[in-house]
């Protein structure tokens, strides 16, 4: 078990975490499909993900409401 295994595990965990949060955002918006907007909302809402991916542009993600 080397670096590629650990890298794959970290990428799989990060993907699963983002998809779980995006699924929650889709459900909150009464949608059955995850769209890029839901991914954008999920990343921005989680503090750790926002710190990691805050400067990443998600295509068709839109802007965050600043209320």
From Swiss-Prot:
CDD domains: HFD_H2A (cd00074)
GO molecular function: DNA binding; protein heterodimerization activity; structural constituent of chromatin
Localization of this protein: Nucleus; Chromosome
Keyword terms, alphabetized: Chromosome, DNA-binding, Methylation, Nucleosome core, Nucleus
UniProt modified residues of type N5-methylglutamine: 60
Superkingdom of this protein's organism: Eukaryota
Any Gene Ontology CC annotation: nucleus
Assembly: The nucleosome is a histone octamer containing two molecules each of H2A, H2B, H3 and H4 assembled in one H3-H4 heterotetramer and two H2A-H2B heterodimers. The octamer wraps approximately 147 bp of DNA.
Family annotation (PANTHER family): HISTONE H2A (PTHR23430)
Function of the molecule: Core component of nucleosome. Nucleosomes wrap and compact DNA into chromatin, limiting DNA accessibility to the cellular machineries which require DNA as a template. Histones thereby play a central role in transcription regulation, DNA repair, DNA replication and chromosomal stability. DNA accessibility is regulated via a complex set of post-translational modifications of histones, also called histone code, and nucleosome remodeling.
Similarity remark: Belongs to the histone H2A family.
Name of this protein: Histone H2A
Taxonomic source organism: Olisthodiscus luteus (Marine phytoflagellate)
Organism lineage: Eukaryota, Sar, Stramenopiles, Ochrophyta, Olisthodiscophyceae
């Amino acid at each position: 078990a080397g670096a590629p295994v650990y890298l794959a595990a970290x990428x799989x965990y990060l993907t699963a975490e983002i998809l779980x949060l995006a699924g929650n955002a889709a459900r909150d918006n009464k949608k059955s499909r995850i769209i890029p907007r839901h991914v954008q909302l999920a990343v921005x809402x989680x503090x750790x993900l926002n710190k990691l991916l805050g400067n990443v542009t998600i295509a068709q993600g839109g802007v965050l409401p600043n209320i």
